[in-house]
From Swiss-Prot:
Cellular compartment(s): Cytoplasm
GO BP terms: DNA replication, removal of RNA primer; mismatch repair
UniProt-listed Enzyme Commission number(s): 3.1.26.4
Pfam name, any one: DUF3378
PROSITE patterns: RNASE_H_2
Swiss-Prot/TrEMBL catalytic activity: Endonucleolytic cleavage to 5'-phosphomonoester
Cofactor names: Mn(2+); Mg(2+)
Gene designation: rnhC
Name assigned to this protein: Ribonuclease HIII
Length: 298
């Protein structure tokens, strides 16, 4: 794990940091002798009354390079990522942990070094580091450069498939294998595919690819979104998720908060009360514990 990163912020930078971390859905608390502590799955930011900011966590280097320096400190001193210019395919998903809305799976095929250089030049990175407006603009660039495929499983279809597979990782493997198969060159040659290892066993996704008779080398690893092509796929998946949520909100005239926290459960209760459980089932992932709790009045 990288060592802690320490920097002193001005008052305006502190306020800017707090606002932007809230937009990124960091979880806030206030341990003793701090102004605040904000956490994501990979980064912890602790701000002290002196203005000292301490950043820790396995995702701290990427957080500093792609967010803190350009957006808060307005510097660019952190080490650059070495460019990997090998043609490859990346795949990622969005919406897996969101109660409302679809599961979106995207694949991106960067077929040559020039395309890859442009992805690096445009600072393509893990969508979790980006605001939704930045995601939308990068998604347009990625679609103009790369061959792309996106599957959007709206809740009704998602729930149907979950009923068939009875396991989220098996469903994810089927969806990942589908977009990989759709984009993989035939024959694949030296082109390979990269995916996050979302299941305990690498065999879960490999088995799904074998069923489709997809002949391509597959690399599965934790935090695969550090790779620029997987990051591009994460951006397309997130962009599709955000647009799909908006579409559902317009179609059913409801507000659908992202995530699976207290505000999401409160919104679900209100929808079930005002519009019925049948509508709730059309716009949410019904295997979530949240759905049963809402329907049982907990």
């Amino acid at each position: 794990m990288p060592p802690p990163f320490v920097v002193t912020l001005t008052t305006s930078a502190q306020n800017n940091l707090r606002d932007q971390l809230k937009e990124k859905n960091f979880i806030f608390s206030q341990p003793q002798n701090t102004v605040f502590q904000a956490r994501s799955n990979t980064v912890t930011c602790t701000l002290y009354p002196s203005g000292k900011l301490v950043i820790q966590g396995k995702g701290s280097e990427e957080f500093i390079e792609f967010f803190l320096e350009p957006e808060i400190l307005h510097t660019f001193t952190h080490a650059r990522v070495e460019q990997d210019l090998r043609p490859r395919l990346g795949v990622d998903e969005s919406g897996k942990g969101d109660f409302f809305g679809p599961l979106c799976i995207a694949a991106v095929y960067a077929s040559n070094a020039e395309i890859l250089k442009k992805l690096y030049e445009n600072k393509v990175q893990d969508s979790k580091n980006l605001k939704d407006t930045k995601i939308a603009s990068l998604a347009r660039i990625i679609r103009s450069l790369c061959v792309c495929d996106v599957i959007i499983l709206y809740p009704e279809k998602y729930n149907e498939l979950y009923g068939k597979f009875q396991n989220l990782n098996t469903l994810l493997a089927w969806a990942h294998a589908t977009v990989i198969n759709n984009l993989a060159p035939k024959p694949a040659g030296d082109v390979f595919a990269i995916s996050d290892q979302f299941a305990a066993s690498e065999y879960t996704l490999l088995k799904a690819l074998q069923k489709k008779e997809t002949d391509i080398t597959l690399i599965q690893k934790p935090r695969a979104e550090q790779d620029v092509v997987v990051a591009a796929a994460s951006i397309l998946a997130r962009d599709a998720f955000v647009q799909s949520i908006q579409k559902l909100e317009e179609q059913y005239q409801v507000q659908l908060p992202k995530g699976a926290g207290f505000n999401v459960k409160a919104a679900g209760r209100e929808i079930a009360k005002q519009r019925g459980k049948e509508l709730l089932a059309k716009i949410s992932k019904t295997h979530f514990k949240t759905f049963d709790e809402i329907c049982s009045g907990k």
